Amino acid sequence: MSKNHQKVVLVGDGQVGSAYAYALVQQGLAEELAIVNLSKEQAEGDALDLEDATVFTAPKQVYQADHHACADADLVVICAGAAQKPGETRLDLVGKNLEIMKQITKSIMATGFDGILLLATNPVDVLTYAVQKISGLPASRVISSGTSLDSARLRIALAKKLGVSPLDISANVMAEHGDSEFAAYSSATVGGKPLLQICEEQGISNDELLKIEDDVRHKAYEIINRKGFTAYGVATCLMRITRAILRDENAVLPVGAYIDGEYGIKDNYLGTPAVINASGISKVIEVPLNERESEAMTKSAEALKKIATDGMTKVGLVNYLIK
């Protein structure tokens, strides 16, 4: 990855993709941003609009492109796919989005792309697993937004409950980005002090913590029911991961990472803290879990693996499962 000229390709310029592109421009990340979208006119419009914004942020080439732009990209961010609708779970999107990911991944890899892939399309854990298998890229270079957004939501909820800044809370949501996720309360801290100790001192019950966990789990549905989609939160998570990659930060972030032995789980993608730098994921941070959390991690992994296996088989990707 060149330090002097970094190129990002965005695939999918919908609500999330366009919000991500705007965040990228606002942060002055990368010198080149290519936007690939089914509707070329929309991508051209966004590119022209974002180009104006660069005058006030940092010089950047922003333009509409096709998949050939991926050939020399440092990072390709995939936001394309069918969006979650009111009443749908993320896992309801498996079939149609696996088919879309199959075509997108093959098109990207046909260009000779050898950078890092970052995914946000749901169900993101299942799709990232499939994309890694199809691409043949090292698992360390195929990452998803994972539970980064869920962890942010947890920190916000806890901050409101405790009357502190979310910046001073260290707490992770883990496993699936979806209905089987859980809050790893046993390792959470507030200003360095164990969260559970603070809750005991303040009379905050376990039931209250489980209610917060459930609210975090369902926050996306609340947003979708009101405005039809989520975009700003996940786009900002993608920007944060992008910054860690392009600036080689060695930042510990909750992402969707390949798990192969950690937590007693093999060959899966799950939300967990990991060290992110210019090589992608340099290390998975295996968080100590209590019995409840460990069981939740295992159950989530088993459910996701079955969905991935069944889904990939149905769309003709069974041969990739043995790789």
Curated annotation (Swiss-Prot):
GO cellular component: cytoplasm
Domain of life of the native organism: Bacteria
Residues reported in the UniProt entry to bind substrate: Q84, R90, N122, P123, V124, D125, D150, S151, A152, R153, T230
Keywords carried by this UniProt record: Cytoplasm, NAD, Oxidoreductase, Phosphoprotein
Residues with PTM Phosphotyrosine: Y221
Keyword match Phosphoprotein: yes
Family: Belongs to the LDH/MDH superfamily. LDH family.
Name of protein: L-lactate dehydrogenase
Organism of this sequence: Limosilactobacillus reuteri (Lactobacillus reuteri)
Gene label: ldh
